[in-house]
Amino acid sequence: MDYTVIEVPDMNDSVSRISLQGSQYQLRFTWNDTGGYWMFGILNSLGEPLLIGVKVVPQFPLNLFHSAKNMPQGIFAALTEKESVGRRDFADGKAQFAFISA
């Protein structure tokens, strides 16, 4: 399986620029301290939301039910052996955020 690992900044809220399949996107990662989980969103190059507020759960295609022509064709997933992704798990290497191209 060929996939791209996407670095999740060690911040409670961040927006990163990324190029996927020849197009520019922005990914937003937000830590929900009250609930104890990560959320992510996809924005186009202008910062317009394509998908927002998706709870990051391990080993599940996070955008399975959210597909559009203007989004990257593939799935986003959190790869880990853990049952949930904690605040420091991406930074500590216990989890990876990945894009698997279709």
Can you say where each PLM-predicted feature lies in the sequence?
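C-terminal charged interaction modules
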Residues: R87-A102
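Non-cytosolic beta-sheet module surface loops
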Residues: L20, T30-D33
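Short, surface-exposed beta-strand/turn "edge" patches of beta-sheet domains
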Residues: L79-R88
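Acidic, aromatic-enriched beta-alpha/helix-loop junctions
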Residues: D33-L79
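Short, charged/polar N-terminal "headpieces" of proteins
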Residues: M1-Q26
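Short beta-strand/loop motifs in extracellular/secreted proteins, especially
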Residues: S14-S16, W38, A95
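Compositionally biased, intrinsically disordered low-complexity segments enriched in polar/Pro/Gly
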Residues: M1, P72, I100-A102
